Structures are given as C-alpha cells and as structure tokens.
Amino acid sequence: MITPLTQRPAWKALEAHYQTIKGMHLRQLFADDPKRGERFTAEAVGLYLDYSKNRITDETLHLLVQLAEECGLRERIEAMFRGDAINVTEQRAVLHIALRAPRNEKILVDGNDVVPGVHAVLDRMADFSDKIRSGDWQGHTGKRIRNIINIGIGGSDLGPVMAYEALRHYSLHNLSFRFISNVDGTDFVEATRGLDPEETLFIICSKTFTTTETLANAHTARRWMLRQIKDLEGVRKHFVAVSTNAEEVARFGIDTANMFEFWDWVGGRYSMDSAIGLSTMIAVGPENFREMLAGFHAMDQHFYSAPFDRNLPVLMGLLSLWYNNFFGAQTLAVLPYEQYLKRFPAYLQQLTMESNGKHITLNGSQVDYQTSPIVWGEPGTNGQHSFYQLIHQGTRLIPCDFIGFCQTLNPLGDHHDLLMANLFAQTEALAFGKTEDEVKAEGVPDWLCPHRSFEGNRPTNTILAERLTPHTLGALVALYEQSVFTQGTIWQIDSFDQWGVELGKVLAHRIGQELEDENGKSLKHDSSTNALIQRYNRLKQK
C-alpha cells in the first residue's frame, strides 16, 4: 500500500514550513545572504540554472529533497532506466531514454536489448536523409524532392515542428518543410499551397497508423498527389511512414521498405528523437541530429547520477511542485528569449499537461492535491508587450522559467544585448519590484503611486546556455522531460498514459456518423449537444 502523499512526513513538514516562509520577500532573502545568487545555482550539460530568485531557503530545499526521497524518486528513476513497466495502466516500459543511448549501451525490455534496434533505425534514417538532401532520391517523374511535409498530430507533430523551428539555423535551405496536423481542411490547403506534387514528399507519422486526423490528411495527400501524377505506383516515391504498424502502412499503399519503425515503449510526447524526428534529420542532417541525441543522453545521465540537490531536472520539478501544491499557483510561464524557440512552450504544453494532467493515483485513489500546472508562454520580448503586465501586477502568482543564450546565431548590431538586457531586467523586476517609497522619491503624485508600484516577490528560474545548438536543444528538452517525471513520481500518478485523449476520440467517431443523418432523428445526446448538431446540419447545407 502506497502511503498517501499528504501523509508523508516531508509533506507535513513542508506545510508547516510554508507558514513560516510565505510572508518572506525576496528582497530580504537577498539582503540576508549576499551570496544567494551564487549559492542557489546548478550547472550541467551546458545549461546553467539560477534558481536564487525563488521563494525558498536552504530549509525549503532540504525538505523538498527529503520529499523526493520519501516518494521513492531514486527507485523510480532506476526502474525506468532498467526497463521496468512503469507505465502501469498500459503495462509498458517507458524507454525514451533508449532512443538516445550510445551504441555500446545495453537496455533490456523483456530480456531483449533494444539499443541495436534503435541504432538500426537511426542508420536507415540517416541513409534516407542523405538521399533526400543530396537529391539522389527523386520523385516519380525524376524531379528532385524539394518539399517535405510532415503529417501527424500530438507528439507526431509538436516535436518535429518545435525541433525544426529551433534548429532552423542549421537546416538545409534548399528544402522547404511544412507540417500538417489539424483535421481542419484549411491546414492541408495552406500547407500545400503553391507546391509542385512532383517535388513533394509526405512523411506520415502515426504510431498505430489509425489516428483519425492523420489518416484523413494522409488520404487527402494521396488524392492531391494522384491528381498530378495519375499513377498509384508512382505515388509510392512520394510517401514514407513512421509507425509501429506495418500492416496498416501497407494497406494504405506505402511500401514497408519505406517505413521507419519505433516501439510501444516510446510515448508520442516523448518521441521527437525517434523516427518521428525524420523530418528533423532531413532538415539538419544526420550529424546534427546525433548531436541532439547526445545532448538528450548527457542530461539523462546527469538526471540518473547527480545528487538531488544538484540535479537540474529534480530541482526544477521540486520548485514547480512547491508553488503548485503549497502556494496554490496554477500555471507555469515558459519564456524563451530566443526566437528559434517560439514553438517550445507549445511543445511543453503537451509534454507537461498530457503527462501529469491526472487525478487518479497509481493505486486507483483520487488525489487530494493539485497535479500538473497549466503551461503557457511566448518568446521574449513579445510577451512583455502582452501578458507580462498580469505577471507583474495581477492577482495570481505565476512562476516563470526564463531561457536565454549568451551568443546569438544571427549577430545583428546590438540586438542580442537588447534582448538579453530585457531578460535580466524582467527577472530582477519580478523578484524585487518597486516600492511605493521608491516611486514617491521619483516625484510621482501620491494618488498615482499605488498604480506605479510593484510588489515583486514573483518567482523565476533562469536557464542560460552558451548558444542554441542541437546538443543544447537535446539537453533542454530532456531537462523538462525529467522534471515532468520527477513531479509525476511525487504525485503518485502515471505520467505515461493519456486516457483523457481517448474518450473524445470515441465520442467524435459516433458524432461523425450522426452528422451524416441530416434529419437528426438518431441523436441521443444531451439537449445541448443535440441542438448544436442539428443547427450544424441545418446551416452546413446553405
């Protein structure tokens, strides 16, 4: 029997500790400890984490680490790396860590070493990518492939899109990359607008090859291609698949020789470094892709071996939990001061909320505490001119992760210094604010002072790296992956299933059939849903 989280000694100690610390201000914490900005830092795999601007003391950190230990975080990390079936509800191993393991490592699933299979797929991906990049792979009519379109949804889209945007600086610029995920026909129409089918390759990404949205778009892609090529066999040169289901891939009409596999022990939201990343490898090349994998692996090893109080993913996970469960914070803002990371917050939304958006524990009981925060964000400095006002002076506590780089990939005058000056200024302003006395000293009228003062005491992490490289990106993604794992372990939930996604799929399939009944006589929903369907059926005919 698992001891309920809220009954653990460290949890109770943290509840008491929160009462003593909740009124402390970061101004005082920094004044009392001139070296706080040096002490509350950690560094690994090229990432420097400054967590000094958090509402914590040494005692807070000690108790949070104690909580992680009491909740069996060390044992669960070891279980994941061993290949145990820690995805309890689906009885599967969770081994995205094997996707980036070096060739000489050995990781067993049901007694079988999976690492050779991983590298066999990576080698096939590299061979295929080189053929596309060099022009050796040609379409049915002999034209060179110039357009790559990835069709997928969820983890089969968010990871590839994020990685492509993040590593666009390293991409081959004579190839265009587009991504289709939404079943809304507009997504397909706009993604294919202006493209020559004879120069276009579709990568169909679906673990089961039965995902409704992906298959709908894949069939539309095939029809789009056939209008130009008019030869079903010829179309084969324009489609490849990433899937675990060879039978369905063949049924669709893709040669299974052009199927790149991955495995049931890879969850969709953890799959960007598997064959799902084929579009990424084509864009940046096999060498850069392997550098990204090396960054993932290095962070995995740090997570596995570093003491919890110096362990970047553990520290970030514990800090997020601290605000979520004790301060009542409900969201986390991720704010990359790097335009190439513009899709990173959206990627983290799925990673975090699909993993830890759960209310049932591993032993089947309902939680009596908050689980996953809502993750959101935009690149700096854009966000400063939209939602930062709420973070500074609103009524909600919103912890923030700031991400920045010391070197820009695109030197342009003093742009990068301006960008980073804003990052540093925001973390300082959020922490220390501006008192009414400071505002008055500037000659501001008394009536206006409350409006122009800032409470501060808003917690932030700052992650700094030298520059955005494939290796850095891999380390950064793995950092958040393992932070999510840390939180899910402490909350005693299964971070690797997603049953909430399934119910909507079932209902959508049923309603899809009902939309074909224009009279609506077969509707058996609630009065609201029935009325909406009837109105839709009536108006779509106009």
Swiss-Prot record:
Reaction it catalyzes: alpha-D-glucose 6-phosphate = beta-D-fructose 6-phosphate
EC number: 5.3.1.9
Pfam families according to UniProt: PGI
Subcellular location: Cytoplasm
Example GO BP: gluconeogenesis
Gene3D superfamilies (UniProt xref): 1.10.1390.10, Glucose-6-phosphate isomerase like protein, domain 1 (3.40.50.10490)
InterPro entries listed in its UniProt record: G6P_Isomerase, G6P_Isomerase_C, Phosphoglucose_isomerase_CS, SIS_dom_sf, SIS_PGI_1, SIS_PGI_2
Role according to the record: Catalyzes the reversible isomerization of glucose-6-phosphate to fructose-6-phosphate.
Similarity comment: family membership: Belongs to the GPI family.
Name of the protein this chain belongs to: Glucose-6-phosphate isomerase
